[in-house]
Amino acid sequence: MRILAIDPAIRNTGYAVVEGDYRRARALDYGTLSIPRSVSQSGCLLAIKQHLGNLIDKWNPDEMAVERIIYVQSHQTAITMGAAKAAVVIAAAEAGLRIMEYSPKSVKLSVVGRGAAQKTQVAFMVRALLELRETPESDAADALAIGLTHLFSADPLKAHMMERKYI
């Protein structure tokens, strides 16, 4: 199975394309879509949607996995994060992709074994599990972890631990 995994944010959206199953996975592509502060919010949303559309065209994923927005610092941040996530969902919907959403705690539990793991621990485990040469930067590591979580969710021994839902 090939998964496009997204860690949505208005300025730095992490993305990853992972392939495999709950026993073995490999990273095909990953990175961060970084958008300068000079770009308007609407311009950011368009850039996110277009970038994801390009990734979908290039990699032809079977499904998409995204991180659920749980904690935000303010109402304005919640609105901005929601808009970024909407751009992600629209790109997936246009391509007819099924979208699965995972809580941050489920992602950490799946990849590290602790729901309260630190970002550095997640990045370390992503590097180890995918046998990457270098530790990915934070947003890309989060997207890779989301993709791994989706693949791991097919494991009957782990599926019960994950907070997930289709959107």
Curated annotation (Swiss-Prot):
Positions that bind Mg(2+) 1: D7, D139
Annotated Pfam families: RuvC
Function summary: The RuvA-RuvB-RuvC complex processes Holliday junction (HJ) DNA during genetic recombination and DNA repair. Endonuclease that resolves HJ intermediates. Cleaves cruciform DNA by making single-stranded nicks across the HJ at symmetrical positions within the homologous arms, yielding a 5'-phosphate and a 3'-hydroxyl group; requires a central core of homology in the junction. The consensus cleavage sequence is 5'-(A/T)TT(C/G)-3'. Cleavage occurs on the 3'-side of the TT dinucleotide at the point of strand exchange.
Keyword DNA repair: yes
Listed InterPro entries: RNaseH-like_sf, RNaseH_sf, X-over_junc_endoDNase_RuvC
Residues annotated as binding Mg(2+) 2: E67
GO BP of this protein: DNA recombination; DNA repair
Molecular-function GO terms, alphabetical: crossover junction DNA endonuclease activity; DNA binding; magnesium ion binding
Record-stated family: Belongs to the RuvC family.
Protein name (Swiss-Prot/TrEMBL): Crossover junction endodeoxyribonuclease RuvC
Residue stretches in coiled coil: none
Intracellular or extracellular location(s): Cytoplasm
Cofactor: Mg(2+)
Keyword set, alphabetical order: Cytoplasm, DNA damage, DNA recombination, DNA repair, DNA-binding, Endonuclease, Hydrolase, Magnesium, Metal-binding, Nuclease
UniProt GO cellular component terms: cytoplasm; Holliday junction resolvase complex
EC number: 3.1.21.10
Assembly and binders: Homodimer which binds Holliday junction (HJ) DNA. The HJ becomes 2-fold symmetrical on binding to RuvC with unstacked arms; it has a different conformation from HJ DNA in complex with RuvA. In the full resolvosome a probable DNA-RuvA(4)-RuvB(12)-RuvC(2) complex forms which resolves the HJ.
Cofactor note: Binds 2 Mg(2+) ion per subunit.
Organism of this sequence: Akkermansia muciniphila (strain ATCC BAA-835 / DSM 22959 / JCM 33894 / BCRC 81048 / CCUG 64013 / CIP 107961 / Muc)
Catalytic site positions: D7, E67, D139
Superkingdom of origin: Bacteria
Catalysed reaction, written as an equation: Endonucleolytic cleavage at a junction such as a reciprocal single-stranded crossover between two homologous DNA duplexes (Holliday junction)
Taxonomic lineage: Bacteria, Pseudomonadati, Verrucomicrobiota, Verrucomicrobiia, Verrucomicrobiales
